[in-house]
Regions:
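N-terminal nucleophile
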Residues: 1-163
């Protein structure tokens, strides 16, 4: 493939080919998987695509440079508040993990492990890769601090006039 657009099309076509029996209407029956495909081809910008079971795909909006698979109602508000085109990679990484923690705490159908990969622009290798479980000390510490910070913030608000 010469660019990530072709890669996304290829992943979508493979998904259709291997997940739908011949003759089945793929517009009404979803048997495939959803993928996030991203990375960089040397000499080109970084790209990110969400590939749907039907084979079609989308790119993130410039103002919201992230994509989410699956249950979005719990962790996405955190991403919406923090992730911008200018956010630092470390902050984006912590935000992604806290977003995932919110989903884990709110939806029993979502669970570990969490596969977490960091790729840095123009490096052409994975900078960091972890498989996190709930007993991971760093992840547990981060999520505990987040919970404490939320409570501290809530307790710092002035009383409501009817209290």
């Amino acid at each position: 493939c010469e660019d990530f657009d072709q890669i996304a099309k290829y992943v979508g076509s493979l998904n259709l080919k291997h997940s739908s029996p011949k003759g089945m209407n793929t517009d009404t029956v979803l048997l495939g998987s959803t993928f996030i495909v991203g990375g960089q081809i040397k000499g080109q910008p970084m790209e990110l695509f969400l590939v749907y079971p039907q084979g079609n795909y989308i790119k993130p909006a410039d103002s919201k440079p992230y994509l989410v698979i699956g249950e979005v109602k719990y962790g996405k508000p955190i991403l919406d508040r923090v992730i911008t085109p200018d956010v630092k990679l470390g902050d984006a990484s912590r935000c992604a993990l806290i977003s995932m923690d919110s989903t884990l705490k709110s939806d029993l159908t979502v669970g570990p492990p969490i596969d977490f990969v960091v790729y840095k622009k123009d490096q052409f290798k994975i900078a960091s890769q972890k498989c996190l479980n709930l007993n991971d000390k760093e992840f547990s510490s981060m999520t505990n601090e987040w919970s404490e910070g939320i409570l501290k913030g809530l307790n710092s608000f002035p009383s409501i006039d009817w209290e």
